[in-house]
């Protein structure tokens, strides 16, 4: 499987939804592999999260896809309140998990997905596109509360 072609096919699908996208080469980044970035809307008010999709070979027949969404780039004065809610949100979160990246005080959602590579790049991109929207729905559900708790009301 061609990882670059896979990310390019996924980018086309995201662009059809009018998401701003960018392919980022893995140069001195903590991510494994190249990254597809997209600004994904999470509500009718126009709020968006920064979504990073990274994919790299996990085995001969599978690809590990990480969907990392920065929901709040820098948590405000409600850091402790937001931190306390993480346990409740993660207990009921159907896919992935919410967390706080302490170094940047960033609130995120992360989902790792093991993808069998027995299809072509276009088929695999369509499958990941579906998973991205599942993750987006999970994020959209708690986004207003996360923003309010963080102190960014």
What are these regions (language model features)?
Residues 1-52:
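Charge-rich, low-complexity N-terminal segments
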Residues 24, 54-58, 101-103:
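Short beta-strand micro-motifs enriched in acidic
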Residues 36-75:
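Long, continuous compositionally biased terminal/linker segments
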Residues 64-106:
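Short, internal acidic amphipathic alpha-helical interface segments
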Residues 107-111:
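Short, aliphatic-rich beta-strand segments
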Residues 116-131:
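A short acidic/glycine-rich loop-to-helix N-cap element
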Residues 136-139:
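Helix-rich interaction surfaces within compact, conserved domain-sized segments
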Residues 144-153:
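Short, highly charged C-terminal tails/helix-capping segments
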